[in-house]
Amino acid sequence: MTEYLLSAGICMAIVSILLIGMAISNVSKEQYAKRFFFFATSCLVLTLVVASSLSSSANASQTDNGVNRSGSEYPTVYSATSTKKLHKEPATLIKAIDGDTVKLMYKGQPMTFRLLLVDTPETKHPKKGVEKYGPEASAFTKKMVENAKKIEVEFDKGQRTDKYGRGLAYIYADGKMVNEALVRQGLAKVAYVYKPNNTHEQLLRKSEAQAKKEKLNIWSEDNADSGQ
């Protein structure tokens, strides 16, 4: 504010001196008016430029890398469509139970995990018994997890366990998602989709569509009448 007043004062002083000089010289009224308008306009423009520059400098000095002088950070604004990032956690294999169920050592405790968003044909169901392609799905999962050097679990954003106490997660074997691999091979269907535990739903549906197109296993023609 002080610099602004100083600039305006200097301009007014210059204009006053010029006006006095023109008043005592042989200058016509027309020339006097033109020169007065020119100098007054120039003074106004100069004052506005200086004021704008000072204002910008003041605003810039209030922040430094997103932190104001009081030390508080500006809040991070997330879009309405942003999602919480999932992360994988290490586990070790105890055994593969069937196509969509494995038992792992997780955080020092044995825990049974049900693969999220997929359903494989049954092999041990008390009523359904052994369903077609059930043994193949079980063998596929068993081979995938037993041959892996690294097993990881990835929980979704919602419920982590089902009513039986089983963990609900995506299981990875050496970085490859077992859930997706089963669906891609036509050994599992996309099923039990409940928000918000559906982050990888579209990935699985894409793999399922490809398996259907290729008529793999449960989508094969010889399985069309089995109700699978």
From Swiss-Prot:
It is found in: Secreted. GO terms for molecular function: endonuclease activity, active with either ribo- or deoxyribonucleic acids and producing 3'-phosphomonoesters; metal ion binding; nucleic acid binding. Residues 1-23 form the signal peptide. The keyword DNA-binding does not apply. Keywords: Calcium, Endonuclease, Hydrolase, Metal-binding, Nuclease, Secreted, Signal, Zymogen. One of its GO terms (cellular component) is extracellular region. Ca(2+) binds at D100, D119, T120. Binds 1 Ca(2+) ion per subunit. It comes from the Bacteria. Its main location: secreted. It holds the Pfam family SNase. The active site is at R114, E122, R166. Its cofactor is Ca(2+). Disulfide bonds: none annotated. InterPro entries: SNase_OB-fold_sf, Staphylococal_nuclease_OB-fold, Thermonucl_AS. Residues 24-60 form a propeptide. SMART domains: SNc. It catalyses: Endonucleolytic cleavage to nucleoside 3'-phosphates and 3'-phosphooligonucleotide end-products. Its EC number is 3.1.31.1. Belongs to the thermonuclease family. Enzyme that catalyzes the hydrolysis of both DNA and RNA at the 5' position of the phosphodiester bond. This is Thermonuclease. It comes from Staphylococcus aureus (strain MRSA252).
